Structure formats: structure tokens, C-alpha cells
Amino acid sequence: MWYSQLGFQSVIWTQLGTRVGLWLAYAVLIAAVGFISATLAIWARPDAADGSTIRVNGDTIEIGKSVSSKSARRIAVVISLIVGLVFGSQFNANWSEILLMFNSQSFGTKDPQFGIDNGFYVFVLPGLKLIMSAVSLLLLAGIIFSIVTHVLMGGIRITIPVNGHGLFHITKRARRQIGIWLMLNMFAWAANQVLGVFSHLTEEGSRITGATYTTVNATIPVTFIMAAITAILGVILGLWIMKSHTLEGSAPIAARASEALKAWKVPTVAIASAIVVSLVLTVAWPVLLQRFRVNPNAQEMESTYIQRNIDATRAAYGLDKVKAEQYKATTEGEEGALADSAESTAQIRLLDPQIISPTFKQLQQSKQYYTFADTVAVDKYDVDGVSQDTVIAARELDLDGLDNRNWVNDHTVYTHGYGVVAAYGNKVTADGQPKFFEAGIPTQGKLTDYEKYEPRIYFSPNATEYSIVGAPEGTKSWEFDYPTGSEGATNTFKGDGGPKIGNIFSRLLYAIRFGSDQILFSNRVNSNSQILYDRSPKERVAKVAPYLTLDGRVYPAVVDGRVKWIVDGYTTSDAYPYSQMTDLGEATKDSTTESSDTVSSLNSKNANYIRNSVKATVDAYDGSVDLYVWDQSDPVVKAWEKIFPGQYHQLSEISGDLMSHMRYPESLFKVQRELLAKYHVSSANQFFSGEDFWQTPVDPTESQQAQQRDILQPPYYLTLQTGGSSEPVFSLTSSYIPAGSSTREILTGFLSVDSDAGHEKGKIGSSYGTIRLQELPKDSNVPGPGQAQNNFNASADVSKELNLLESGSTNVQRGNLLTLPLGGGLVYVQPVYVKSSGSTSFPLLKKVLVAFGDQVGFADTLDEALDQVFGGDSGASAGDAENVGDTTDDKQDAKNDDSADGKTNTDGKQDTPSNTDGKTGGNNGDSSGTMSADLKKALADAAQAMKDSDAAMKKGDWSAYGDAQKQLQEALNKAIELEQ
């Protein structure tokens, strides 16, 4: 019902049909093999035999006595069916490998060892291995059924030695059957060995993934030889069993050793020879070759195979078209240095998406039953004709915030969130709050000027409970819509968002599924009711496309008047020849995924091929899922399109508005930066030495404990001009420092990828996905992020002001440390937030730190801080130049809102009857945002008191030290009073 309502019923039927089909097919095959094997053994039953007798130390055990051939066949049928069903259930779990094998695609590139298209390894080889494993199990079942049945039917008679005498007898018919089964099993073993040869091309070694010199020149040839030996050994043993009279029981088991050796000479010599040859060829020869030939000349002998690994890795991870350039960065800030980077400077994002989430909640949550993601999203929107970096979040439903929890409220009244909230990425109000351009309840602002805008959020990451919606025409609405007046507005869901449960059968079904009898008896469930469940966007996409690996971040976008959740889907493989294997979970961990509940790393699994082949959207109102083929050149998604025809929309169907919000996904970028830290090196010899390997820096804004655990700095979305781009581009960025444990952290590279897909219907922007790498010279002394953070911390002026900000009941939070290639060098920008210790407090942007080389700027605005490090005039105006400007408009907006209705204005201030001028804090005196004379004096007094304290402590004058400390406390209290 759920899949049918979404229009993805083919997914469940194809998957279910394939799994059941494989299970039944394999169950029938293994049952048939077992039955045929047993039937042949029954047919070969000796005429005079009545079962088999086993004597153990004088005790007689009779097996199969008085069992007729007809009864034996019946027993064989039952046992073979049971075995078939058990093993068939294990085989059906690999349904995807079978489907991909029969729908394989060509990659158009060949592996460098065998010259076979890479599609064979990705699609066909896994299926062949599965089939050969199944065949091996079938043949093993055949020989087991044969031996057991022959024992039961008297074809094999065993007498355990008594006083040194025993007997082992196998009839001629039994020997023929067992010999044939043995040969077939050995042939299957040989075939598996041959298939295993191809797996060497994805074998993980100590340095690279793929076949190295020893593998190519020893292991692979030896494997073919051993496969031939295995097949020959099977023929020898099979023929010996069929023709030898030794097994007819003419001699006792405990005969003299010489006689036994003579009788069993052929199998003994054959097996012993095979073991010796195997040890020499598969163990000794590769070890000796590696030890005495390869290791002393490793760089020369491995270079060919390292180059194969480099080329394959860059191709498999989409790194073969990286635009790299040398960037001779300066560390001397000159006046006017940013004049040529004015557009990039104006777009520098100051709002940290993780730190400001509490601010969003405090200013825009409105009621306790709403919430926002703990890490808001970064996107871009055209506001008044200008592209703006934006922080955006959906106002989701949070049932945990309800005071009165019961079934009616949880499942029929509080059913949805309401609207999105968006703020400029580089602007704040005079008191440090985000400057919203979309906010409030009902929603108002720049994004919702559509005639039919739909703000209701029925489907979201936080919607974990099911909801029952819908009512007959004319019925009074009971769904709570949004707070207004004394009771709030109500609404009735009008979409097609879930299975209908109007009939008693559906109600009973879902009552059982959710363990709730209320679904059966509640009057809220009616003929028009729908049940909404599995409401997380990521969960919905995962169910309709279970073969995709989904990005750890889901973000909202306002598209054509509706709120859409955008989910990035990846096609992956672990079978691309010579490409380096990567743990996707480890590669995508960073400080954000470690601390956030709404952003996660990819699931831990090994892969050596990845593409962002699919973009999925989930409508926040009706939950409809749309899958779009994003990378049309990817053979893997082509295979899935063939398996599930009609499931995907083509690129041409993406609207211009939706296209403008498609961005380069973070998880893919993190995997690529992990690989590029080594694979920016294109020379095999240089790669072997490892002297130019890099690493992603740890996040210097995290605690010391987190840094010791190597929690990496996340990538950041920024609009900037870099690496040969002709104009500023919305990009995803990161940086590199030298690999290893050196304490000298300098910047070695700056990585960015163009993330703007454009805004043309059905056409991806020409530069989208272009990866740009700016490599710094080896003698560069540009500080890395960690060193830049240390420079901030070591600055006496910065420390002094931060100490003042942290006094009393406030604390300082450092925002994301951004790295930007500006002014001929690298500029570091870090917003500084101040938060009081109250339970309802929230961070406010108060200061901005800037570093260029070893120079540090610290001011109320980015504009001022940039001027400090660039000779008093940076030559460009940052986007926050007006952040300390007049707040008259803010106050007027606040006055115009209806405080009794709990509305919020687009500048972010929640109205209350006692605060009609819209202020929520900040300096109540000077509205221009400049420091008042009294505040300057208080700060100067505090600074002087600190100097007096230091001087007194050095002299050991503790009385004077106590007086200075008292004066310091008084000055700080005065400063705090003036600042509030």
C-alpha cells in the first residue's frame, strides 16, 4: 500500500519477485540435485543388501535395515526439500548482484592487466562468483547425499577395527557415482580459483589496492597453474575411485603399512604432490620473489602498478579532471589588496550553521512543539535580484515539546510543522541576531511571494510518529495549523500523502502494525482518512531506492512555491580494478557529524567507486518522492534504470527553480578530499616516496580532547572566486596541511568545487562539479587552520577583549574558521559569538576575527577586521558593513506585528506585549552600534586594572594586587551593565 501510493510498486515487486524467485529456484535446484543423487544411490543398491552394518568393537549398528527403495526415495525428497529451502534463503539475499549481472553496462574503459571492460568487474564478476558458490554448494550437496544414501542402502559397508581387523567395502556402482561427484566438485573448485584471479585487481595491499609486481608475476600465473592441478587431481582421484579394487573390501583396514601404502599409492602420491606443489608455488615462490627481488628494487618494480592505481583511483572517484594550479601565496597584507576580490569579499559567510541553530529556535520557534535542525543548511537564493548565501531551516514538528501527550494529540492534532526560516549568511542585526528575509508565522518574506505557497511540513527528519489526516467535506478541521489568537488556526490535509485507511481491513492492518487499537475505534479515523508514516525524507528515499547510498545531510529548499527536501544519492562499487579502497564512513566523519544529530557520515562500508548519480526530492507537504538521474554517464545508475524502468525522471524534467538549489554534496566532496590528499600526486615514483602527501586538518575550533582524536574540519559552502574561475561561484571548500605528526602546521593546498548547478531547466551549469586545487609552494609559510587559530589565541589584544566578553554570566563561542584565497594569499575568517548563561539565551554575533599571514584583525565587523590586516583599507567592502547601522527599520517592523498572536517579523525578533519596539538585547544607548564614551572608559579602566594586577603580582605586593583585582571587577561589571 505504501509503495503503491507513492507510485513505486515496481520496486517492491521486482525486489520481492527476484528474492523469492532466487530462493525457490535455488531450493528446487538443491532439492533436485539431492533427490537425483539419492535416487541414483538407491538404484545402485546391492541386490542382496538390506541396509548397512557398522560394527564397532563388537557392537553391531544396523543402518537402513528393512528400508525399501520406495521409502528411501520419500525420505530423500523430504530431506532434500528441507536442505533446499534452508540454503535457498541464504542465496536470495544477493538479489542485487544477480540483477546487475543480467543488466550490466559497459564502462568504456578496460583494466590494464587483462584488457577487460571494467563493467565485467563491477557487474558480471560478483554475479559469477555468486553463481559458482551456488554451484559448488549444489555439487557438495550431491556428493553428501550420495555417500549417505549408499551407506544407508548398503553400497558402502564399514566395519570399525576389532582386535586389529576391520573392513571397508564400496560396491562398483557406488564407486562410479562417488567418483563422478568428486570430479565435479574438484572442477567447481578449479573454476572458483580461476574466478579468484580477477579479484586480485581489487585486493588491498600494504600500499595500494590492486595487483602489484609479485601478484602479477607470481600469484596470478600460479593460480591458473593450481586451477589446472586441481582439475587434474579431480580426474585422477575420480578415476582411481571408480577403477580401484582396493575399496572392494578384499583386504582388512588394519593391514600392514606397506600393503596399505601400495594399495593407496595413487591417491596418496597425487594428493601429496599437489600439496607440495601448492606450498612451493603459492607460498614459497611469491615470498622469495617479494623478499629478494622486489623489496630491494621496490620503487622501480612497483612503479607500473602504482601508476595503474593512481590512474584508476582518479577515474573511479571523479578526480581525473581536477584543475590544479600553483598558488604563490603571500603573507604580507597590503593596502587595497582585496580590490580585485570585491565580489567574493562581499559574500563571506559569517553565520555558523551549527552555532546559530539555538538562535533560530529562540527567535523563530514560536512554540515549544516546533523545532529546527541542530545544524541549519547553507544554500543560495536570489534576493532582490542578487544571489545571497543563505542559512535556512524548516520549522519542524517536535512532539516532545507538547505538554499534553496523548494518542489524539500525537497522531491527529499535531501533525505538521510550518514554514521555513532563512537569513542572510553575511548579515546580522545591530545586536548580533541573524537578519532574516523569510520568517514568522504565518510565513512572510522574500521566498514565499507565490500565490499558492504551501508552508505546511508534514514530512521532515523530525517527524518520527505516524499521523492520521483527512476528513469528510464540511467537517470542522481538527489539525492544529499554527498559533494565532487563543486557540490557534486549524487545517485539514488535502493532499495524497499516505495509504487510505477508510475501510475496516486497512484500519485493522495498521492497528496491528503500529500496535494501537485507537486506529480501530477513534472517530478521527473516517472514510477520507490517510495514514502518514515513514515520514523522514531520507527513510522514504531509502525505501524506494534501497540500492543507493544516501548522503548524511538532508536540506530543505523552497521550490516553485513548495518546500522540498533534497537528498543526494550515490551509486558505489567495491569492484573497480586498481582503484583505492576507502571506508566511506571514516572518510566522511568530521566535527559536524560527530556533534550533530541531523548530519551524519555515510554508513561504514568499503568502496572504490562512487558517483553522485541521483538527486532525490521529497515534498514536505505530501511526501511524494521524485528521483532524478543526475550523472547520466554513470554505468551503475544506467543498470538500475534498466532494472526499474519508469522509476527515474530525466535531467530535462528538473525545473529551473529546483536546479538552482542542487548543490555539490558534502559526503562526496569529503571522500574526494580524502583521496586527493594522496592522489594529487600523479607520478608513481613521487607517490612511492610519500614525501608530498597531505591531510585534512583537524577542526581547531573543537576542544583539545576532540583534536587529539583527530576530528577533522568540515568543508564549508562559500561564494568565492578561485582556481581559474572567472567570477565568484558558490563552492564547497576545504584545505590541506602536510601529512604526518609534525607540529609545524602550514597550508599546502586549498581545495574547492563549483557547487552552483545554475538555474536553467534541465541543464546543469557548465562549471558545476569542477574541482579546483590550488597548491602552495613547498617553501610556503602560510599558516594552516590550526596555526591561524593559535595566532588568534596568542594575540594579546584579542585575549584581552575575549576575557572581557567572557566575564560575568556570558561565554564566548568561536564559529567556523573559514579559509579563503583572497588578496594574493589566504585569509582566515572566524565569527565570534557571545552567549549568556541563561537557559533561554542564544548566541549573538559580536565580533569577527581575521588573519592574513601572521597578522590578526579583531573588530565588530568583518569589514573593519579586514581593514586592520590590510593596511587600514582592504580595498573591498564586506557584506556586513551595515551590520552596526541604524535599526529603525527593525523597530518599525516589530511595531507592525501582532504580538498577541505570537507572530515574528522577518528580522527575527519575536514580539511580546512588553517589548513593542522590537529590541531583544544589545546596547540600549547608542543605536548606531558604536562604542559609547562610558563603555570605552569602563574598558580602559579594566585594562589598567589588569596591568596594575600584573605589576603588583611581580612585586609580590599582594595588598596592591587585591585592590587592583577589586577595581578590575568593578570595571567589568560597569562594562557589562553598559553593554546590556
Predicted regions and their residues:
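Soluble extracytoplasmic regions of secretory-pathway and membrane proteins
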Residues: 1-5, 9-955, 959-964, 968-979
